[in-house]
Amino acid sequence: MTSLMSNENEEKDAEKVDQAIEMISAGQGPEAHKLLMEVIKNTPEKYDIKIEKYGNFFIRFWDQAEFVHYVNYGSEEKDEGDISWIPNTYPRAFYFIGFLYMQIKDFPRAVAAFEEGQRLDPGHPMFHLEKAQAYYQMGAFDKALSEYEMVKGVGLRVSEDRYAAALRGRGIVQIETGDLDSAEAVLKESLEYDPGNNIALHELGYIDHLRKGRHTGQSTMVETGDGTLRPEHKEKPKKRKHFFWKA
C-alpha cells in the first residue's frame, strides 16, 4: 500500500481525515478544522486518483458507496482488470474544510477550499454540488446554476442520488430566478433517478403555489451535499423551506 501513496505522510493523513469527519459529526468543528489543516500541509502538487499497477487499477474512492457504484456501473469507460479501493486523502480534506466554512457562513473561503480539492480530484461531483450551494448562499444564482449543470448525468463517478441532487439544485435556483417552467422540468426529471423524493415533491408543490399566487419569498433552510440542513444567511420576510440533497 505504501508504494501507492502520494507521499510518506499519506497513510497517517488519511486516518486524520477520517478522525476529523468523526469530530464534525460530534459537533467538534474547531478541532476538526485544526486536524484538517495539518493534513493539507502535506498536499502534493499532483495527485493521481487512478493508478494502474501490477495489471490492476487502484482508485481513490471517498467511501464504500462510491466504490460499490463504480464496480457495479455498466459502462464502456470502466477499466478492465481488478479494481481496488485506496484512500482519498487530500481532496476529502479540502472538501471538509470547505464544509466547515459553510457552517460558519464564510462562503468565499468555502469556495476556495472546494476549488483546491477539485484541482486534485476534478471528476468528483461533490465539489460542484457544494460550490453551487455556496454561490447560492451568496446570491450568485448564475454561478450556482452553472455548477449544478456541470454534473451532467449518471456515470462512473456520479451515482443516481447525486445526479438527482444536482437536478434538484438546478430546480431550486431556477425557482429563485423565476424560471418556473425549467424548474418544474428538472425537478420532475430528478424523480426519475430518485423516485418519491420529498424534496423534489415539496418544490413541485411550491411551484404550484407560486403559480396560484399563494406564496412568495425565499427559503429559511438549505441542504448541503451530505444531507444536513443549514439556516439560510439572508434574513427576509415570508420565507419558505427548501432542500437540495435528501429527504
State what each model feature region is.
Residues 29-30, 107, 141, 180:
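TPR-repeat structural position
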